[in-house]
Protein backbone atom coordinates (compact mmCIF):
# COMPACT_ATOMS: atom_id res chain seq x y z
CA UNK A 1 0.00 0.00 0.00
CA UNK A 2 1.38 3.42 -0.99
CA UNK A 3 2.35 5.86 1.72
CA UNK A 4 3.15 9.54 1.17
CA UNK A 5 2.79 11.79 4.19
CA UNK A 6 4.31 14.83 5.87
CA UNK A 7 5.29 14.80 9.55
CA UNK A 8 5.59 18.23 11.18
CA UNK A 9 8.46 18.41 13.67
CA UNK A 10 8.36 22.19 13.98
CA UNK A 11 6.45 25.10 12.43
CA UNK A 12 7.64 28.14 14.38
CA UNK A 13 9.79 31.02 13.13
CA UNK A 14 13.19 32.28 14.28
CA UNK A 15 12.37 33.39 17.84
CA UNK A 16 12.13 30.31 20.09
CA UNK A 17 8.76 29.90 21.77
CA UNK A 18 7.15 27.38 24.10
CA UNK A 19 4.25 26.79 21.71
CA UNK A 20 6.22 25.88 18.60
CA UNK A 21 9.45 24.14 17.67
CA UNK A 22 11.69 25.49 14.94
CA UNK A 23 11.29 24.54 11.30
CA UNK A 24 11.62 20.88 10.39
CA UNK A 25 9.54 18.30 8.55
CA UNK A 26 9.80 14.66 7.58
CA UNK A 27 8.46 13.41 4.27
CA UNK A 28 7.59 9.72 4.57
CA UNK A 29 7.40 7.96 1.22
CA UNK A 30 6.69 4.26 1.60
CA UNK A 31 8.68 4.10 4.83
CA UNK A 32 11.73 6.01 3.59
CA UNK A 33 12.22 9.30 5.43
CA UNK A 34 13.43 12.60 3.98
CA UNK A 35 14.00 15.61 6.25
CA UNK A 36 13.29 19.19 5.21
CA UNK A 37 15.15 21.75 7.33
CA UNK A 38 16.55 21.02 10.77
CA UNK A 39 16.00 23.75 13.34
CA UNK A 40 17.33 23.46 16.89
CA UNK A 41 15.91 20.49 18.77
CA UNK A 42 14.58 18.71 15.70
CA UNK A 43 16.06 15.45 16.96
CA UNK A 44 13.80 15.66 20.04
CA UNK A 45 10.64 15.86 17.95
CA UNK A 46 12.02 13.16 15.67
CA UNK A 47 12.20 10.77 18.61
CA UNK A 48 8.92 11.97 20.12
CA UNK A 49 7.13 10.99 16.90
CA UNK A 50 8.70 7.51 17.04
CA UNK A 51 10.29 7.91 13.63
CA UNK A 52 12.89 5.32 12.65
CA UNK A 53 16.31 6.96 12.54
CA UNK A 54 17.73 4.26 10.26
CA UNK A 55 15.18 5.28 7.61
CA UNK A 56 16.49 8.86 7.39
CA UNK A 57 19.37 9.18 4.93
CA UNK A 58 18.68 12.48 3.15
CA UNK A 59 18.28 16.00 4.57
CA UNK A 60 17.31 19.06 2.52
CA UNK A 61 18.17 22.51 3.94
CA UNK A 62 16.32 25.47 2.44
CA UNK A 63 18.73 28.18 3.58
CA UNK A 64 21.41 29.04 6.10
CA UNK A 65 19.42 30.81 8.80
CA UNK A 66 19.83 29.24 12.21
CA UNK A 67 16.20 28.31 12.74
CA UNK A 68 16.45 26.05 9.68
CA UNK A 69 19.86 24.42 10.18
CA UNK A 70 21.19 24.72 13.76
CA UNK A 71 19.72 21.30 14.59
CA UNK A 72 22.07 19.46 12.24
CA UNK A 73 24.82 18.97 14.82
CA UNK A 74 22.35 17.66 17.40
CA UNK A 75 20.89 15.28 14.86
CA UNK A 76 24.34 13.93 13.96
CA UNK A 77 25.06 13.50 17.67
CA UNK A 78 21.85 11.51 18.14
CA UNK A 79 22.75 9.28 15.21
CA UNK A 80 26.19 8.59 16.71
CA UNK A 81 24.64 7.64 20.06
CA UNK A 82 22.15 5.35 18.34
CA UNK A 83 24.90 3.51 16.50
CA UNK A 84 24.38 4.75 12.97
CA UNK A 85 26.84 3.46 10.35
CA UNK A 86 25.09 4.47 7.10
CA UNK A 87 26.14 7.67 5.32
CA UNK A 88 24.01 10.79 5.81
CA UNK A 89 23.47 13.07 2.80
CA UNK A 90 22.78 16.80 3.18
CA UNK A 91 21.56 18.89 0.23
CA UNK A 92 22.01 22.61 0.71
CA UNK A 93 23.74 25.86 -0.19
CA UNK A 94 27.46 25.38 -1.04
CA UNK A 95 28.50 27.18 2.17
CA UNK A 96 26.92 24.47 4.34
CA UNK A 97 29.93 22.17 4.10
CA UNK A 98 32.50 24.78 5.13
CA UNK A 99 30.29 25.84 8.06
CA UNK A 100 29.37 22.44 9.48
CA UNK A 101 32.18 20.08 8.51
CA UNK A 102 34.71 21.65 10.93
CA UNK A 103 32.19 21.35 13.78
CA UNK A 104 31.47 17.73 12.93
CA UNK A 105 35.20 16.93 12.84
CA UNK A 106 35.79 18.74 16.13
CA UNK A 107 33.00 17.10 18.13
CA UNK A 108 33.12 13.63 16.55
CA UNK A 109 36.72 12.46 16.25
CA UNK A 110 35.80 9.02 14.94
CA UNK A 111 32.46 9.41 13.20
CA UNK A 112 31.17 5.91 12.32
CA UNK A 113 29.48 7.21 9.16
CA UNK A 114 30.14 9.83 6.52
CA UNK A 115 28.25 13.12 6.31
CA UNK A 116 28.14 13.81 2.58
CA UNK A 117 27.33 17.35 1.46
CA UNK A 118 25.60 17.88 -1.89
CA UNK A 119 25.68 21.59 -2.85
CA UNK A 120 23.19 23.11 -5.27
CA UNK A 121 22.71 26.46 -6.97
CA UNK A 122 19.95 28.31 -5.04
CA UNK A 123 19.36 30.78 -7.86
CA UNK A 124 17.73 28.36 -10.29
CA UNK A 125 15.31 25.46 -10.20
CA UNK A 126 16.75 22.02 -10.79
CA UNK A 127 16.65 18.33 -9.97
CA UNK A 128 18.89 17.71 -6.94
CA UNK A 129 17.89 14.20 -5.90
CA UNK A 130 16.42 11.13 -7.54
CA UNK A 131 15.94 7.53 -6.51
CA UNK A 132 13.62 4.75 -7.64
CA UNK A 133 10.47 6.34 -6.22
CA UNK A 134 11.13 10.07 -5.79
CA UNK A 135 12.47 13.19 -7.45
CA UNK A 136 13.29 16.40 -5.54
CA UNK A 137 13.54 19.77 -7.27
CA UNK A 138 14.59 23.15 -5.89
CA UNK A 139 12.24 26.14 -6.00
CA UNK A 140 14.15 29.47 -5.85
CA UNK A 141 12.56 31.81 -3.29
CA UNK A 142 13.11 35.45 -2.35
CA UNK A 143 14.50 35.98 1.15
CA UNK A 144 17.30 37.90 2.86
CA UNK A 145 19.80 35.14 2.06
CA UNK A 146 19.82 32.64 -0.84
CA UNK A 147 16.84 30.37 -0.20
CA UNK A 148 15.00 27.59 -1.96
CA UNK A 149 11.86 25.60 -1.46
CA UNK A 150 11.58 21.95 -2.42
CA UNK A 151 9.23 20.04 -4.66
CA UNK A 152 8.86 16.35 -3.78
CA UNK A 153 7.50 14.45 -6.74
CA UNK A 154 6.56 10.81 -6.43
CA UNK A 155 7.38 8.81 -9.52
CA UNK A 156 4.36 7.21 -11.22
CA UNK A 157 3.82 3.50 -10.65
CA UNK A 158 3.35 1.17 -13.61
CA UNK A 159 2.03 -2.39 -13.68
CA UNK A 160 3.64 -4.90 -16.02
CA UNK A 161 2.04 -7.87 -17.70
CA UNK A 162 2.69 -10.83 -15.41
CA UNK A 163 3.99 -12.82 -18.35
CA UNK A 164 6.62 -10.24 -19.20
CA UNK A 165 9.90 -9.66 -17.42
CA UNK A 166 10.67 -6.16 -16.24
CA UNK A 167 12.77 -5.01 -19.14
CA UNK A 168 12.61 -4.68 -22.88
CA UNK A 169 10.85 -7.47 -24.81
CA UNK A 170 12.34 -8.87 -28.01
CA UNK A 171 9.95 -10.31 -30.60
CA UNK A 172 10.71 -13.32 -32.80
CA UNK A 173 11.70 -10.87 -35.50
CA UNK A 174 14.34 -9.37 -33.20
CA UNK A 175 12.35 -6.16 -32.85
CA UNK A 176 12.83 -4.60 -29.44
CA UNK A 177 9.68 -3.39 -27.72
CA UNK A 178 10.11 -0.85 -24.95
CA UNK A 179 8.99 -1.98 -21.51
CA UNK A 180 6.75 1.11 -21.35
CA UNK A 181 4.61 -0.44 -24.09
CA UNK A 182 4.06 -3.52 -21.95
CA UNK A 183 2.85 -1.68 -18.87
CA UNK A 184 -0.01 0.51 -17.75
CA UNK A 185 -0.18 3.40 -15.32
CA UNK A 186 -1.31 2.07 -11.93
CA UNK A 187 -1.37 5.37 -10.06
CA UNK A 188 -0.70 9.02 -10.68
CA UNK A 189 2.22 10.59 -8.87
CA UNK A 190 1.62 12.90 -5.92
CA UNK A 191 3.53 16.13 -5.35
CA UNK A 192 4.37 18.14 -2.25
CA UNK A 193 5.84 21.66 -2.32
CA UNK A 194 7.60 23.26 0.64
CA UNK A 195 8.10 27.05 0.44
CA UNK A 196 9.73 28.74 3.43
CA UNK A 197 11.10 31.45 3.87
CA UNK A 198 10.03 33.98 1.25
CA UNK A 199 8.23 37.19 0.47
CA UNK A 200 5.16 37.06 -1.75
CA UNK A 201 6.83 35.76 -4.88
CA UNK A 202 4.71 34.98 -7.94
CA UNK A 203 7.67 33.48 -9.81
CA UNK A 204 7.17 30.22 -7.91
CA UNK A 205 3.65 29.68 -9.28
CA UNK A 206 4.65 27.78 -12.46
CA UNK A 207 6.87 25.47 -10.37
CA UNK A 208 4.13 24.45 -7.93
CA UNK A 209 1.02 24.50 -10.11
CA UNK A 210 -1.42 21.74 -9.22
CA UNK A 211 0.53 20.20 -6.34
CA UNK A 212 -1.42 18.00 -3.94
CA UNK A 213 -0.16 19.92 -0.91
CA UNK A 214 1.60 23.27 -0.59
CA UNK A 215 3.34 24.28 2.63
CA UNK A 216 3.83 28.05 2.49
CA UNK A 217 5.20 30.23 5.21
CA UNK A 218 2.71 32.57 6.89
CA UNK A 219 4.90 34.34 9.41
CA UNK A 220 2.68 37.39 9.71
CA UNK A 221 -0.88 38.61 9.61
CA UNK A 222 -1.93 40.96 6.85
CA UNK A 223 -2.05 43.76 9.42
CA UNK A 224 1.74 43.36 9.75
CA UNK A 225 2.55 43.51 6.04
CA UNK A 226 5.14 46.23 6.58
CA UNK A 227 7.05 43.95 8.94
CA UNK A 228 6.68 41.04 6.52
CA UNK A 229 8.16 43.12 3.71
CA UNK A 230 10.99 44.36 5.92
CA UNK A 231 12.00 40.84 6.96
CA UNK A 232 11.31 39.18 3.58
CA UNK A 233 8.48 37.03 4.87
CA UNK A 234 4.85 36.46 3.83
CA UNK A 235 1.44 36.92 5.38
CA UNK A 236 -1.22 34.22 5.59
CA UNK A 237 -3.28 36.07 3.01
CA UNK A 238 -0.34 36.25 0.61
CA UNK A 239 0.21 32.49 1.00
CA UNK A 240 -3.42 31.89 0.09
CA UNK A 241 -3.09 34.08 -3.01
CA UNK A 242 -0.17 31.95 -4.17
CA UNK A 243 -2.15 28.76 -3.49
CA UNK A 244 -5.14 30.01 -5.47
CA UNK A 245 -3.04 31.21 -8.39
CA UNK A 246 -1.18 27.88 -8.52
CA UNK A 247 -4.42 25.89 -8.30
CA UNK A 248 -3.03 23.65 -5.56
CA UNK A 249 -5.28 21.11 -3.88
CA UNK A 250 -4.52 21.99 -0.26
CA UNK A 251 -2.55 24.72 1.54
CA UNK A 252 -0.78 24.30 4.87
CA UNK A 253 0.42 27.41 6.69
CA UNK A 254 3.47 27.48 8.96
CA UNK A 255 6.57 29.37 10.18
CA UNK A 256 4.41 31.33 12.61
CA UNK A 257 5.71 34.43 14.37
CA UNK A 258 6.04 34.13 18.14
CA UNK A 259 4.19 37.44 18.50
CA UNK A 260 0.83 35.72 17.96
CA UNK A 261 -0.50 33.66 20.90
CA UNK A 262 -3.04 31.97 18.62
CA UNK A 263 -2.83 31.45 14.84
CA UNK A 264 -6.56 30.87 14.29
CA UNK A 265 -7.00 34.35 12.86
CA UNK A 266 -4.22 33.63 10.34
CA UNK A 267 -6.20 30.62 9.19
CA UNK A 268 -9.31 32.76 8.76
CA UNK A 269 -7.37 35.34 6.74
CA UNK A 270 -6.20 32.63 4.35
CA UNK A 271 -9.50 30.75 4.10
CA UNK A 272 -11.27 33.87 2.84
CA UNK A 273 -9.24 33.45 -0.35
CA UNK A 274 -8.37 29.75 -0.36
CA UNK A 275 -10.86 27.72 1.73
CA UNK A 276 -8.92 24.43 1.71
CA UNK A 277 -6.29 25.76 4.10
CA UNK A 278 -5.02 24.26 7.36
CA UNK A 279 -2.54 25.25 10.05
CA UNK A 280 0.58 23.20 10.64
CA UNK A 281 1.13 21.99 14.19
CA UNK A 282 3.84 19.99 15.89
CA UNK A 283 3.55 16.20 15.58
CA UNK A 284 0.90 16.51 12.89
CA UNK A 285 0.93 13.72 10.31
CA UNK A 286 -0.71 14.75 7.07
CA UNK A 287 -1.29 12.12 4.36
CA UNK A 288 -0.84 13.39 0.81
CA UNK A 289 -2.18 10.29 -0.93
From Swiss-Prot:
The keyword Zinc applies. Its EC number is 3.1.26.11. The lineage of its organism: Bacteria, Pseudomonadati, Bacteroidota, Bacteroidia, Bacteroidales. NCBIfam families: PRK00055.1-3. The active site is at residue 67. SUPFAM superfamilies: Metallo-hydrolase/oxidoreductase (SSF56281). It catalyses: Endonucleolytic cleavage of RNA, removing extra 3' nucleotides from tRNA precursor, generating 3' termini of tRNAs. A 3'-hydroxy group is left at the tRNA terminus and a 5'-phosphoryl group is left at the trailer molecule. Zn(2+) 1 binds at residues 63, 65, 143, 197. It comes from the Bacteria. The gene is rnz. Its cofactor is Zn(2+). It comes from Azobacteroides pseudotrichonymphae genomovar. CFP2. GO terms for molecular function: 3'-tRNA processing endoribonuclease activity; zinc ion binding. PANTHER family: ZINC PHOSPHODIESTERASE ELAC PROTEIN 1. This is Ribonuclease Z.
Amino acid sequence: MRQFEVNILGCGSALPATRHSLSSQIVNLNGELYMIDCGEGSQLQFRAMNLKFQRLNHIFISHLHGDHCFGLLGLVSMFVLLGRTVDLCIYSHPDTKCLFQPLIKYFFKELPFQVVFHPFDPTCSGLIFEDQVLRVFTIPLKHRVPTVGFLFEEKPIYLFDNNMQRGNFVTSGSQTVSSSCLSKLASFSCRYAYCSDTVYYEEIIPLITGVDLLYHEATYSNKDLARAKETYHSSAQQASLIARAANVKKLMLGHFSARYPDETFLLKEAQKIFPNTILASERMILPII
